[in-house]
UniProtKB/Swiss-Prot annotation:
The gene is RLP27. It comes from Arabidopsis thaliana (Mouse-ear cress). It is a single-pass type I membrane protein. Glycans are attached at residues 56, 68, 90, 103, 108, 144, 167, 213, 313, 363, 394, 407, 420, 480, 544, 632, 648. Residues 1-31 form the signal peptide. It holds the Pfam family LRR_1. This is Receptor like protein 27. Belongs to the RLP family. It is found in: Cell membrane. Residues 762-808 are cytoplasmic.
Length: 808
């Protein structure tokens, strides 16, 4: 009976503690009901050590597991990005000494060293601490974690060596990649009896490695050593690890070529990565020996000049990457007959043609085909029936887009940009719009109108048909593409009005209409805000748009009103799979230059209305677009003042307001824009002093020319220099006569004065010495005195003028 009372009281205490801890959030965390009160308190204290406002109570404690019998915390897995701040050396986390599983990866810990307190958690079997920004060496206390099976410290800033692993005898997976570890690999590492996976990529490791004496004693199956600084004969000991299934030796920086025959004994090897290494030429022929079970072979940037015939023997090959080499000529016909070939990357070589019948490619099993950046010419080949991704940009293909492309119902990405294709865009592209995500036909010679073919449920996210000869109007069926993010039809002959109707697309981020025949107003009929929900790039330059912009035009541009996204890794059109990355490209007139911008950040915001016939005042609401990087309103007919609110656009790097009819002064607040690298207000009607800030005075004079009333650097030194008097032409004759009279009266007096001075200097009469005194200072020269008074009078007048202007 006493036992049941104790259990009951223990449960009551746990529930009461839960109530008091979480009453303010009105959230019942059921998962903690089996945890002891002291354990719940430790978890709560750990949470309170950080700013955890990005996650709610439920998210935080969903990753907690407690032992059903003892109530101690055995598992803690926090959601990514939940914690902000630095981890204390005496954190309450280290009091949870019964933890067996701990995952704190991808949080926002302030850069600091790894606390040695982790060594107190000696029951840990799994520890994930990747992507947290930890600095310095791994504490020696980590050698106490003798029960560890999995240790992941990848994607941090850790340094030094890692001798602590020699005591981790139960370790099966060790991930230390993407750090700054240096020195040699400990000799004891490969002798760990249970080690099956080792990832040391992207460090500064040197020397060689020492493999176990007996090849059967190593259980190592996955080994990743790429991007280090090994100098010695590292391949010889690796060749003894015959149980390997995955091996990455990319960019080893060794001084000798790699012989593929070294891997002939790897009967289980299915993935081999040798990118960035020189290969022994004789080892890539069909006579060489290579593991026949290979499914994935990556030979990127290996300096190859001939197609490796060793591939003939790899009947199980699924993925081959030969990109960034110098292979020339034709792709051999036998290559497409490899029965399990799925992914082929031939990017950036010197290929000119495909050998054999086009049916060989059509009937192949290839799903991902990258032929981009080669010298292919002639008609574009019919793609494989099984194709998912087809990239052939930057070649010299000619003729029409094959209609057979439309029969590839699983095609998701089609990129045929930068070729010489002609004819219309096939209407049959609608046949696979339920799979099509990207259509990029940029910079060809395509004609006709853009097909109005999109129906409900279309998955299209990117449509880029810029730099063609397209006519007609924008297809209204684009409204059915609810996932559309990027639309570029620039440099065509499309004749239409501004597509206000595209505001209905909830995810549209970039709209480029540059250099077409668009016309009419760009203000909504109700004169309200334009208000695209997520639009960040709006390029409509060099059209025939007219009218004025209402004061609230830039209100409710939600995406562009936000501050810059600090995550610089996210790009528009970043539709990637493990083997291919597609990124949108946009042409920008930026910092006075016209450039093609690849890898456009989702946080990037730019507006270009230049080269139209827009008039009226520039709306003050432009200052709401805090994420704006570039603003170009040049070559229009804008009037009025430059908006003072531009000083609020703190991310602005490029501002072009040239060739308008703007008046007034340049706002002084522009000099506070610390990122402003380019500004042009040339050829307006501006007056007054140019703001004297480093970002502005460092600009070229041409950025301010054509404004008669502007002064100050970089045009001239000061706006307040005294004017130089210019004689009037009608007074010149009179002045000449006056000077003649002065000279005639001057010379006799001058001659008499010189004679008297000579007498005084020679004889020094005592009466003169008594009057003047031998040490009495000389009086000011009357001419110099007059010039001094005149200078002070000018200074007084200048000061008075400045005060009057400042009062105005």
């Amino acid at each position: 009976m006493l036992f049941f009372i104790k259990v009951f009281m223990k449960t009551i205490l746990s529930v009461l503690l839960l109530f008091f801890i979480f009453a303010s959030s009105f959230t019942l965390v059921v998962g903690l009901a089996g945890c002891r009160p002291d354990q719940i308190q430790a978890l709560t204290q750990f949470k309170n050590e950080f700013d955890s406002s990005d996650c709610n109570q439920t998210d935080y404690f969903n990753g907690v597991q407690c032992d059903n019998k003892t109530g101690v915390v055995t598992k803690l897995q926090l959601p990514s990005g939940c914690l902000h701040g630095s981890m204390k050396p005496n954190s309450s986390l280290f009091g949870l000494q019964h933890l067996r599983y701990l995952n704190l990866s991808n949080n926002n810990f302030t850069s600091a060293s790894l606390p040695s307190g982790f060594g107190n958690l000696n029951r840990l079997e799994v520890l994930y601490l990747s992507s947290n920004g930890f600095l310095g060496q791994v504490p020696s206390s980590f050698s106490n974690l003798s029960q560890l099976n999995i240790l992941d410290l990848s994607h941090n800033e850790l340094t030094g060596s890692f001798p602590f692993v020699q005591n981790l005898t139960k370790l099966s997976i060790l991930v230390l990649s993407y750090n700054h570890f240096s020195g040699t690999i400990p000799s004891s590492l490969l002798t760990l009896p249970f080690l099956s996976s080792l990832d040391l990529r992207e460090n500064y490791l040197t020397g060689s490695i020492e493999a176990p004496n007996s090849s059967t004693s190593s259980r190592l199956e996955f080994m990743y050593l790429g991007n280090n600084h090994f100098e010695g004969q590292i391949l010889e000991p690796i060749s003894k690890l015959i149980n390997l299934k995955h091996l990455d030796l990319s960019f080893l920086k060794t001084s000798y070529p790699i012989d593929l025959n070294l891997f002939s004994s790897f009967k289980s090897l299915v993935r081999l990565v040798l990118s960035g290494n020189s290969l022994l030429a004789t080892s890539i022929t069909s006579d060489s020996k290579i593991p026949l079970n290979l499914e994935n072979l990556v030979l990127l940037s290996c300096g190859l000049i001939e197609f490796p015939t060793i591939l003939k023997n790899l009947t199980k090959l699924e993925h081959i990457d030969l990109s960034n080499n110098k292979i020339k000529g034709k792709v051999p016909e036998w290559f497409w007959n490899l029965p399990r070939l799925r992914r082929v990357n031939l990017f950036n070589n010197l290929f000119t043609d495909l050998e054999g019948s086009e049916e060989v490619l059509v009937n192949s099993s290839v799903r991902l085909l990258d032929l981009a950046y080669n010298h292919f010419r002639g008609p574009f080949p019919k793609p494989p029936l099984s194709i998912n991704l087809l990239s052939a940009w930057n070649n010299s293909f000619t003729g029409n887009i094959p209609l057979e492309t439309c029969n590839r119902s699983s095609l998701a990405i089609l990129d045929l940009s930068y070729n010489n294709l002609t004819g219309p865009i096939p209407r049959c592209l609608s046949d696979f719009q339920e799979s099509l995500i990207v259509v990029n036909l940029r910079k060809n010679n395509l004609e006709g109108s853009l097909p109005d073919i999109f129906s409900d449920g279309a998955l299209l996210r990117t449509l880029d048909v810029g730099y063609n000869q397209l006519t007609g109007k924008l297809p209204r069926s684009l409204l059915n593409c609810s996932m559309l993010r990027f639309v570029s039809v620039d440099h065509n002959k499309i004749k239409d009005t501004f597509p206000f109707w595209l505001k209905a697309l909830p995810d549209l981020q970039a709209l480029t209409l540059r250099s077409n025949k668009f016309h009419g107003p760009i203000s909504p009929p109700d004169r309200g805000p334009l208000a695209f929900p997520k639009l960040r790039i709006l390029e409509i330059s060099d059209n025939n748009f007219t009218g004025s912009l209402p004061p609230n035009y830039f209100v409710n541009w939600e995406a562009s009103s936000l501050q810059m996204n600090e995550d610089g890794r996210i790009y528009m059109g970043d539709y990637n799979n493990p083997y291919y990355i597609y990124e949108d490209t946009v042409d920008l007139q930026y910092k006075g230059l016209f450039m093609e911008q690849g890898k456009v950040l989702t946080s990037y915001a730019t507006i270009d209305f230049s080269g139209n016939k827009l008039e009226g005042q520039i709306p003050e609401s432009i200052g709401l677009l805090k994420a704006l990087i570039a603003l170009n309103l040049s070559n229009n007919a804008f009037t009025g003042h430059i908006p003072l609110s531009l000083a609020n656009v703190t991310e602005l790097e490029s501002l072009d307001l040239s060739r308008n009819q703007l008046s007034g002064t340049i706002p002084n607040g522009l000099k506070t824009l610390s990122f402003l690298a380019y500004i042009s207000v040339a050829h307006n009607q501006l007056i007054g002093e140019i703001p004297q800030g480093t970002q502005i005075t460092g600009q070229s004079k041409s950025s301010f020319e054509g404004n008669a009333g502007l002064c100050g650097l970089p045009l001239q030194g000061s706006c307040f220099a005294p004017p130089t008097p210019q004689p009037k032409e009608e007074d010149e004759d009179e002045e000449v006569l006056n000077w003649k009279a002065v000279v005639i009266g001057y010379w006799p007096g001058l001659l008499l004065g010189l004679i008297m001075a000579h007498v005084i200097a020679s004889f020094k009469p005592k009466w003169l010495v008594k009057i003047v005194g031998p040490e009495k200072r000389k009086e000011d020269n009357p001419v110099r005195l007059f010039m001094t008074l005149d200078s002070r009078w000018d200074s007084f007048n200048n000061k008075k003028n400045v005060e009057q202007k400042s009062d105005m």
